[in-house]
């Protein structure tokens, strides 16, 4: 077995997994369906968490007993947790900028690559953490600043390499679209090929480096966006992932007792042999995924990063079918949008459902834009 889920607490541990999974799915729906929900979660709750964490750390620095013994200070003080929560939340805000066309940046062509950049940063944070364990404790173990015993070894290297490969499994960086009612930022080229490779890599990362949290962040936290992405939110997996990751990280930063010290707490078996098997699976999955992407790119004759490689596939078409009507986008586009920005939005939105092989939008000057686009927007 991968986890110690036996004994008197087993019913609570399984119930906790189901509770976390359900809560993440529900909170994701709340955050994605309206501007209020998204702003409440990623501005309001994040601000409250920041104030709380600063208060705890300032209190600890001043020697206050309540702060020195606070679980946020004792159990969540590593660089990784703070880097992860703010990187994930930055991703959520950036995705909202894209789907709501907020500001010049949110409507810029270059900003369509933001999802790739922020996901790559999040992956690199975990890769560094994996390599940290390998360097600190090769074929042995070390105790983190949070008091967690971590093994180190070749499995960290295997999974670190898997994470680096996973970054190159993200294709069609500029193929970002807006869903009906502007509820989702869609990335149709991010299909099951990437999702499976990512989930296996990320599960392995949590198993290697977060053994006290992996039951929840390695299972429930990965299942929540994947279930939504497979069943009702095609093309929106990466937004689901960012939203649920940010919310989970904020919860753990403020209530770490749930996963560390309660009846719901679960430890992995923390066995290097098991770590190695899981890491090899993650590495092989990412090698296969990247190989398949290279194959499709060569078959279509496209650059897999500047252009989409899964055009014509079932998953790609289902995601593209969820795009908002052009008329709705024109009606809801901010009045500050320029004709050039509107023209780009329309060009993306009127691509066929199956996509267009080799499509790469060329940014135009305002003088080249048909004024009819601007007229339609204001009707």
What are these regions (language model features)?
Residues 44-65, 93-100, 116-133, 192-208, ...:
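Hydrophobic alpha-helical transmembrane segments and adjacent interfacial helices
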Residues 2-5, 66-79, 139-156, 266-278:
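Membrane-interface segments at the starts/ends of alpha-helical transmembrane spans
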Residues 2-102:
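An N-terminal, globular interaction/scaffold subdomain
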Residues 21-25, 217-342, 346-348, 358, ...:
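C-terminal transmembrane-bundle signature of multipass membrane proteins
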Residues 15-24, 83-99, 159-174, 221-226, ...:
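Hydrophobic cores of alpha-helical transmembrane segments in multi-pass inner/ER membrane proteins
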Residues 105-235:
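Generic multipass alpha-helical transmembrane bundles of integral membrane proteins
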Residues 61-66, 105-108, 131-141, 210, ...:
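A cytosolic-side transmembrane-helix exit/cap motif
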